[in-house]
Amino acid sequence: MTIIEVKIKKLENFSGNLPAYATEHSAGVDLIAANEQTILIKVGSIQLIPTGIAIALPDSFEAQIRPRSGLAIKHGITVANSPGTIDADYRGEIKVLLINLGKKDFLIERGMRIAQMIIAKYERVLWAETSILTETMRGRGGFGSTGL
């Protein structure tokens, strides 16, 4: 496993501890809500939740914002644009777009673990335009073409 250094800035609304891995083999760190007041997410609605942090990722890395499984299974709270992408050149506050797919309104309290963030390396592509693609067994079979 490679460990990279990522610079992190605590903003004025920051609360609690820096994002941390819950276990030795956790892929993501928990993001904490840094809202000044309780935020109500009504059933079927979306709210933007501040985290109070900004980061500076190295080139060729992104941060992916993903749901926390406990919030999803217990309350129907998930990340609306999952996975959300934080680009390496973004320096603003990381915010999480949460949606309530549950059956009850849900309150986001300051200090609550609201999402997880995974740092991932990515590659850039150089498109090679062509009029013919190589044949495969699947071909152009799309949704459901490989079975249920």
From Swiss-Prot:
Residues the record lists as binding substrate: R68, S69, G70, N81, T85, I86, D87, K95
Reported EC number(s) for this entry are: 3.6.1.23
Q: Which InterPro entries match?
A: dUTPase, dUTPase-like, dUTPase-like_sf, dUTPase_trimeric
Keywords, in A-Z order: Hydrolase, Magnesium, Metal-binding, Nucleotide metabolism
Specify the superkingdom.
Answer: Bacteria
Q: Which family does it belong to?
A: Belongs to the dUTPase family.
> What pathway does the UniProt record associate with this protein?
Pyrimidine metabolism; dUMP biosynthesis; dUMP from dCTP (dUTP route): step 2/2
SS bond list: none
Q: Which reaction does it catalyse?
A: dUTP + H2O = dUMP + diphosphate + H(+)
Top-level EC class: hydrolase
Q: From the record, what ranges are coiled-coil?
A: none
Q: Name one GO molecular function term.
A: dUTP diphosphatase activity
Name the needed cofactors: Mg(2+)
What does this protein do, in the record's words? This enzyme is involved in nucleotide metabolism: it produces dUMP, the immediate precursor of thymidine nucleotides and it decreases the intracellular concentration of dUTP so that uracil cannot be incorporated into DNA.
**What biological-process GO terms show up in the record?**
dUMP biosynthetic process; dUTP catabolic process
Q: What is this protein called?
A: Deoxyuridine 5'-triphosphate nucleotidohydrolase
